[in-house]
UniProtKB/Swiss-Prot annotation:
Main location: cytoplasm
Annotated Gene3D superfamilies: Aldolase class I
Molecular function per GO: transaldolase activity
The reaction(s) this protein catalyses: D-sedoheptulose 7-phosphate + D-glyceraldehyde 3-phosphate = D-erythrose 4-phosphate + beta-D-fructose 6-phosphate
Pfam families attached to this UniProt entry: TAL_FSA
PANTHER family in alphabetical order: TRANSALDOLASE
Pathway entry: Carbohydrate degradation; pentose phosphate pathway; D-glyceraldehyde 3-phosphate and beta-D-fructose 6-phosphate from D-ribose 5-phosphate and D-xylulose 5-phosphate (non-oxidative stage): step 2/3
Protein name: Transaldolase
Active site, per annotation: 136 (schiff-base intermediate with substrate)
Keywords, alphabetical: Cytoplasm, Pentose shunt, Schiff base, Transferase
GO BP: carbohydrate metabolic process; pentose-phosphate shunt
Organism: Trichormus variabilis (strain ATCC 29413 / PCC 7937) (Anabaena variabilis)
Source organism phylogeny: Bacteria, Bacillati, Cyanobacteriota, Cyanophyceae, Nostocales
Coiled coil regions, renumbered to chain: none
Length: 332
């Protein structure tokens, strides 16, 4: 009997759940899980997770001490909420959870390093070692440099919002643990740019981008793992079968599970080793030049940081409203 696509994918690629929804993670039993500001905000709005939100707020209020302003309490709770979700997720997965640094720090190396250390300290205080956490940082030059320093301290990083080969090479040269090249968002850009409704999966610009990055890494023996992310359909996923990891939303995990058929391996280190690829080295000037020349990567990195910032601001508003409600309840 032919296995479903998800079972076959798991034989060649580590399957990761891209969600903050703990029930969805329990359903699909991935090895790892990834969260981002948008996913944490979405989960924080779900009725089944109000208890996590409330507990985090009440603990933050207690720790902030008497006389702390609402803003200070919300700020403290905000930092802790992603870790609260991460801790719950780590109870049900055997591997690692990715927790994102505040996207508003994406162009500030020092602030990113400080925030990453704080997140790791919170996990450590809850009994979780750094080997089970990936700190997610946007793939700006400043973010990559922050991650390079963090990796030397034993803090493992997942460089996200990655759209171009220049970003990927800079990450590999910096010794980053893992990158998340985005597939669907690249497709979105090209569809808008060309006016096309769709692309065959093998010609999908996002698929081509991740394939190029994977082949480059394997050709030159980089240890940085490639985790394709941001999928719009299962065709994009099946075209990247064989990638080190793929992080997939619950909806698409369900679709893969419900689909029976053969799944051939598309990405293969042995095949990559035979390719004729030019090796390039990336310093800041080269990075800036290549980034400016790659309009898609330039647009999508900027848009991604703005999108995550908007989600963070929405979460802060949500926490402030929730705190006010808890205080009203406490005063009665």
């Amino acid at each position: 009997m032919t296995k479903n696509l998800l079972e076959q994918l798991r034989e060649m690629t580590v399957v990761v759940a891209d969600t903050g929804d703990i029930q969805a993670i329990e359903k699909f039993t991935p090895r790892d899980a990834t969260t981002n500001p948008s996913l944490i905000t979405a989960a924080a709005k779900m009725p089944e997770y109000q208890e996590i939100v409330d507990q985090t707020l009440l603990q933050a209020k207690k720790d902030a001490g008497a006389g702390a302003s609402k803003g200070q309490i919300v700020s403290l709770a905000f930092d802790r909420l992603a870790v609260s979700f991460g801790l719950k997720i780590l109870q049900i997965i055997p591997g690692r959870v990715s927790t994102e640094v505040d996207a508003r720090l994406s162009y500030d190396t020092e602030a990113t390093i400080t925030k990453a250390r704080e997140l790791i300290a919170q996990y450590k205080a809850a009994g979780i070692g750094p080997e089970r956490v990936l700190i997610k940082i946007a793939s700006t030059w400043e973010g990559i440099k922050a991650a390079e320093i963090l990796e030397k301290e034993g803090i493992h990083c997942n460089l996200t919002l990655l759209f171009g080969l220049h970003q990927a090479i800079a990450c590999a040269e910096a010794g980053i643990t893992l990158i998340s090249p985005f597939v669907g968002r690249i497709l979105d850009w090209y569809k808008k740019e060309t006016g096309r409704d769709s692309y065959p999966s093998a010609e999908d610009p996002g698929v081509i981008s991740v394939t190029t990055i994977y082949n480059y890494y394997k050709k030159f023996g980089y240890t940085t793992e490639v985790m394709g992310a941001s999928f719009r359909n299962i065709g994009e996923i099946t075209e990247l079968a064989g990638s080190d990891l793929l992080t997939i939303s619950p909806g698409l995990l369900g679709e893969l599970q419900a689909t029976i058929g053969e799944l051939p391996r598309k990405l293969d280190p042995a095949k990559a080793a035979t390719l004729d690829i030019e090796k390039i080295s990336i310093d800041k000037a080269t990075f800036d030049k290549m980034h400016a020349a790659d309009r898609m990567a330039y647009d999508k990195l900027d848009e991604g940081i703005k999108g995550f910032t908007k989600a963070l601001e929405e979460l802060e508003t949500l926490l402030a409203e929730r705190l006010a409600r808890l205080e009203v309840v406490a005063s009665h």
